[in-house]
Amino acid sequence: MKALLLTFVVSLAAGAQPRIILVGDSTMAVKSGYGPGFCAIVRSDAICLNMAKGGRSTSSYRAEGSWDQVMEKLKTGASDTWVLIQFGHNDQPGKPGRSTDLATEFPDNLRRYVEEVKSAGAHPVLVTPLTRRSFRNGQLQDTLGPWADAAKKVAAELGAPLLDLHAESMAAVQKMGAVEASTLAMAPPPAVVIEGAAAGNSPNVLKPETADPNAPVFDYTHLGAKGSAFFGRMVASELAEAVPALQPYLPL
């Protein structure tokens, strides 16, 4: 496992129902991320609440009021609640209204999330961003390493458990290669992708014109059912290792 363990022994109260809340972007969200695959593993006597939203950064998730909704949930049952926090994709440059400064804003925003979860009496868990699945000459391209490193530093500084999903997902995707990695997307890979993947490359893919704006499309970031199940299990395994109190609720 690649979970970086700052493990704290947290005991559930007798008869308590543990709750796991997912906070993040589209790579975690319903329909496009690993959240559904993760929640499918969580036992029915625990609660898995996916509050991740596509297109959000550490800044915009708070600015639009989504974080207020999370904090509202923590007004009850906080001591038996773990909040998994994963951002990075939309904090990168070139995303107006969402991008954050890597050296200052991004870590500051993560610190604030962690500290507010702790103040509410709940348990924050930082998660480094899921890798993209873009290859060049057989090598997976690391486009999120600095954001993963920033999350690691904040976790170490604040004594919060951290799941290094970035490292483990990169290792897994590199091992499977471009062809297999292309099957994890929301839609089947088009012919140009299949041809490129056979040579160890990930060609650019234009978004197809469609009458349905919500129709799933192929890309190297988002996940279909297969990808959600694969990475959801990875996160569940990391969480079970990092937070022993949750192991009985994460059958693997």
What kind of feature is each model-predicted range?
Residues 13-14, 121:
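N-terminal regions of proteins, emphasizing targeting and processing segments when present
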Residues 10, 43, 88:
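Residue-level marker of positions within ordered structural domains that often coincide
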Residues 68-252:
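Alpha-helical cap/lid subdomain in secreted, periplasmic
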Residues 15-60, 67-79, 83:
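Serine-esterase "nucleophile elbow" of acetyl-processing enzymes
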Residues 58-62, 173-176:
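Short, solvent-exposed polar/charged micro-motifs at secondary-structure junctions
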Residues 3-12:
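Sec-dependent N-terminal signal peptides
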